[in-house]
Amino acid sequence: MTTDVIADMLTRIRNANQRMLKTVNIPSSKMKLEIANILKEEGFISSFTVEGEVKKTITIELKYQGKQRVISGLKKISKPGLRVYAPANEIPQVLNGLGIAIVSTSQGIMTGKQARLSNIGGEVLAFVW
């Protein structure tokens, strides 16, 4: 069993994206659902659905433009051994605004841009570009 469920989610998406797969299945949790929702809102994935009764899984439908991947890269920033926290004014921009930072705040999980606008700092979970 993996100890870092967010890293596992990002790795599954990265591997499926590299193989140009249409969908990827991920064990479900509230945090993963929020991250999937952010990826959908920002246009990195087409859609996601939750399936199953007892053991719920998230099925993410990856997005491609012809033969080009929409997700160029995913990087886990805060790790179990080294947590990375940033105040609102120090949340990094990803590729000068072309990517997103996913931040866990006291108000929930949101993009770096939303956190800066709300003036809320938090734990920088990942970068997606």
UniProtKB/Swiss-Prot annotation:
Q: Which Gene3D superfamilies match?
A: 3.30.1370.30, 3.30.1490.10
InterPro entries, sorted:
Ribosomal_uS8, Ribosomal_uS8_CS, Ribosomal_uS8_sf
One GO process term, biological-process aspect = translation
Report keywords, A-Z: Ribonucleoprotein, Ribosomal protein, RNA-binding, rRNA-binding
Q: Which GO terms describe its cellular component?
A: ribonucleoprotein complex; ribosome
Pfam families referenced in this protein's UniProt entry, alphabetically:
Ribosomal_S8
Sorted alphabetically, which SUPFAM superfamilies does this protein's record hold? Ribosomal protein S8 (SSF56047)
Protein role = One of the primary rRNA binding proteins, it binds directly to 16S rRNA central domain where it helps coordinate assembly of the platform of the 30S subunit.
> Which family does the similarity line name?
Belongs to the universal ribosomal protein uS8 family.
Quaternary assembly: Part of the 30S ribosomal subunit. Contacts proteins S5 and S12.
Q: What is this protein called?
A: Small ribosomal subunit protein uS8
Origin species, per record, is Mesoplasma florum (strain ATCC 33453 / NBRC 100688 / NCTC 11704 / L1) (Acholeplasma florum)
Taxonomically, what lineage is the organism? Bacteria, Bacillati, Mycoplasmatota, Mollicutes, Entomoplasmatales
